[in-house]
Amino acid sequence: MTIAPEGRRLLRVEARNAAVPIEKKPPWIKTRATMGPEYTELRSLVRREGLHTVCEEAGCPNIFECWEDREATFLIGGDQCTRRCDFCQIDTGKPADFDADEPRRVAESVQAMGLRYSTVTGVARDDLADGGAWLYAETVRQIHALNPGTGVELLIPDFNAEPDQLAEVFSSRPEVLAHNLETVPRVFKRIRPGFRYARSLSVLTAARDAGLVTKSNLILGMGETTAEAVEALADLHAAGCDLVTITQYLRPSPRHHPVERWVKPEEFVELSDEAERIGFLGVMAGPLVRSSYRAGRLWGQAMARRGLEVPPALAHLTEPTTSRQEAASLLR
């Protein structure tokens, strides 16, 4: 394999990855397609209105559960990222022209879908003078303006930790500000060459200092050890991270980093317990957990543990419930 699907030649790292065959998934990597009434109604509406979500377009296995709770995820900034991470399905290249109308369209999609909680993520836009900070912030502002009772989780790149860019994003006041660390220091440069471990931690610290609920994610199976994962959890908490998700790496294509180990549900339970001991306000861990999985529920848990008031429209997010992809649920 020497040519990528989009017609360009493979990068050296991609060619090296492609020499390793795609791994066979273990039996515990599975999900059930349970289509409840809310999911069915939402799917019909999305098809009828021609709306676009990451949930459908990325084929997320958790779409049935999240849509049943009226939660969905949107990607902004285009489909080309200016950075390349060895695990990420999004293509790297020259992004499309900046679309200043995108925040309005996302907000209208949230309204049309009747979402109670939405996650907004996007690509890195180092080609823009502000790194795309206005686009991220304006999307949150537009969602809140058009949907006053809807919660927003904003998953951001690091904006090179530029104070002015971060201040613009933080001023939009999302319910949760997320920035994903993803992996441990020893393999960080190989997996995320466009990012820096300490810089990612500093973004979370800045968000905490701005009074926001903060969140991050760790992906297992890219060369880390369990002990290193625990150390990364401690680093995240020390940096001011409130919420954390822990997940299994699934290789998107032969061009991406090979899976180095399959983490059993029992280890996810142990890491979840360790994260609770470290002091996180909310933890979601399991092979098919993703950073936006049951995002509203995790935020509700954090608010309850902080003793903070939850708006009436989002009160359902504080009710005790089980999540199908949590490792503890898989062991029952």
Curated annotation (Swiss-Prot):
HAMAP family: Lipoyl_synth (MF_00206)
Binding site for [4Fe-4S] cluster 1: 55, 60, 66, 292
Residues binding [4Fe-4S] cluster 2: 81, 85, 88
Signal peptide: none
Superkingdom field: Bacteria
Enzyme class: transferase
Family statement: Belongs to the radical SAM superfamily. Lipoyl synthase family.
Protein name: Lipoyl synthase
Keyword Cell cycle among record annotations: no
Compartments it resides in: Cytoplasm
Keywords of this entry: 4Fe-4S, Cytoplasm, Iron, Iron-sulfur, Metal-binding, S-adenosyl-L-methionine, Transferase
A Pfam family reported for this protein in Swiss-Prot or TrEMBL: Radical_SAM
Cofactor: [4Fe-4S] cluster
Entries under SMART domains matching the protein: Elp3 (SM00729)
Pathway: Protein modification; protein lipoylation via endogenous pathway; protein N(6)-(lipoyl)lysine from octanoyl-[acyl-carrier-protein]: step 2/2
CDD domains with a match to the protein in the record: Radical_SAM
Catalytically driven reaction(s): [[Fe-S] cluster scaffold protein carrying a second [4Fe-4S](2+) cluster] + N(6)-octanoyl-L-lysyl-[protein] + 2 oxidized [2Fe-2S]-[ferredoxin] + 2 S-adenosyl-L-methionine + 4 H(+) = [[Fe-S] cluster scaffold protein] + N(6)-[(R)-dihydrolipoyl]-L-lysyl-[protein] + 4 Fe(3+) + 2 hydrogen sulfide + 2 5'-deoxyadenosine + 2 L-methionine + 2 reduced [2Fe-2S]-[ferredoxin]
Gene Ontology CC, one term: cytoplasm
GO molecular function, a single term: 4 iron, 4 sulfur cluster binding
Cofactor note: Binds 2 [4Fe-4S] clusters per subunit. One cluster is coordinated with 3 cysteines and an exchangeable S-adenosyl-L-methionine.
Gene: lipA
Major location category of this protein: cytoplasm
Domain Radical SAM core: 67-281
EC number per UniProt: 2.8.1.8
